[in-house]
Amino acid sequence: MIFVIGLGNPGKEYQYTRHNIGFIVIEKIANQYNLSFSTKKKFNCEIVESSVEKQKLIFIKPTTYMNLSGKSVISVKTYYNICSEKIFVIHDDIDLETGRIKFKTGGGNGGHNGLKSIDRVIGNNYNRIRIGVGRPQNNQDVADYVLNNFPRSEYEIVIQSIDKITNNFDLILENKLEEFKNKIG
């Protein structure tokens, strides 16, 4: 079983913000497999459950807002008895330049409130797909920065990153994590 969490905030006003890149990517991956999300209130998320290439697959988008993402993650993890090594969190990262992608297992949260919330309930030994959104300029507040939409000048770079993850997602299903890391990095 593979459990993939796209981090973001619910609501149209956040749909295309830097902080919602996790939602954007997970939706694109789900579309690739012709899968649709449905709301599960007991898990505080939108969820997709399916089998792809003989692999049970669960995608979620927490509906709790970023700072409480762990609430959804622990609910689904517990219900399906998923081990942390099979969890993949897709999220924005201000410490990476816009469009840069990094894959890692375990580690710190880099000040990311969604990851902090997840770490509190399941620890930090899970996989992360980090997507760079760049750092704010001119002393702009980080929270304001990540809650802004990507500027048009960054669209092409962001789309290429989303496509790179989506086009190589099958490698995760095949448990070829090192190859996935090399292809997206």
Curated annotation (Swiss-Prot):
Q: Where is this site: Stabilizes the basic form of H active site to accept a proton?
A: D92
Provide the active-site residues from the annotation: H19 (proton acceptor)
Q: What is its main location?
A: cytoplasm
> Where in the cell does this protein reside?
Cytoplasm
Q: Which PROSITE patterns match?
A: PEPT_TRNA_HYDROL_1 (PS01195), PEPT_TRNA_HYDROL_2 (PS01196)
InterPro entries in the record:
Pept_tRNA_hydro (IPR001328), Pept_tRNA_hydro_CS (IPR018171), Pept_tRNA_hydro_sf (IPR036416)
State the Gene Ontology terms under molecular function: peptidyl-tRNA hydrolase activity; tRNA binding
Q: Which PANTHER family match?
A: PEPTIDYL-TRNA HYDROLASE (PTHR17224:SF1)
Q: What is this protein called?
A: Peptidyl-tRNA hydrolase
Q: Which organism is it from?
A: Rickettsia canadensis (strain McKiel)
